[in-house]
UniProtKB/Swiss-Prot annotation:
Its job: RNaseP catalyzes the removal of the 5'-leader sequence from pre-tRNA to produce the mature 5'-terminus. It can also cleave other RNA substrates such as 4.5S RNA. The protein component plays an auxiliary but essential role in vivo by binding to the 5'-leader sequence and broadening the substrate specificity of the ribozyme.
Family, similarity comment: Belongs to the RnpA family.
Domain of life of the native organism: Bacteria
SUPFAM superfamilies for the chain: Ribosomal protein S5 domain 2-like
Quaternary context: Consists of a catalytic RNA component (M1 or rnpB) and a protein subunit.
Gene Ontology MF terms: 3'-tRNA processing endoribonuclease activity; ribonuclease P activity; tRNA binding
Biological processes per GO annotation: tRNA 5'-leader removal
UniProt keywords, alphabetically: Endonuclease, Hydrolase, Nuclease, RNA-binding, tRNA processing
Catalytically driven reaction(s): Endonucleolytic cleavage of RNA, removing 5'-extranucleotides from tRNA precursor
Protein name in UniProt: Ribonuclease P protein component
Annotated organism of origin: Lactiplantibacillus plantarum (strain ATCC BAA-793 / NCIMB 8826 / WCFS1) (Lactobacillus plantarum)
Gene: rnpA
Pfam families: Ribonuclease_P
Coiled coil, from the record: none
Disulfide bond sites: none
């Protein structure tokens, strides 16, 4: 995923958090900020220390990024969103992570059901 598709700065994270527009399942919390006219979506990923050590957290982040890359054609383009991983996602396979993430994105109305 290219840098232009990522929310990186703390101020950008805060803008999305301040909307208080969140959706959740047992594995992920999704915060959404609608940005009409934006050429493509941007995503920020947050994995807390409750997930495990740095290796485990980076592993979870890689799986989330891979899932988003695979779901990219179906994602709503005019929004910034944050994906916050909950501890229950640790140790899940790539297929399970993608399924849980797609469920959370559908709850947030960010995923088209083509």
């Amino acid at each position: 995923m290219r840098k232009s598709y990522r929310v990186k700065k703390e101020t950008e994270f805060q803008q999305v958090f301040e909307t208080r527009n969140s959706y959740a399942n047992r594995q992920f919390v999704i915060y959404v900020l609608e940005k009409p006219g934006q050429p493509h979506f941007r995503v920020g990923i947050s994995v807390g220390k409750k997930i495990g050590n740095a290796v485990a957290r980076n592993w979870v982040k890689r799986r989330i990024r891979q899932s988003i890359t695979e779901l990219k054609p179906q994602l709503k383009q005019d929004a910034d969103f944050l994906v916050i991983a909950r501890p229950t996602v640790a140790g899940k396979s790539q297929a399970e992570t993608k399924a849980y993430l797609s469920h959370a994105l559908k709850l947030a109305h960010l995923l088209d059901n083509d």
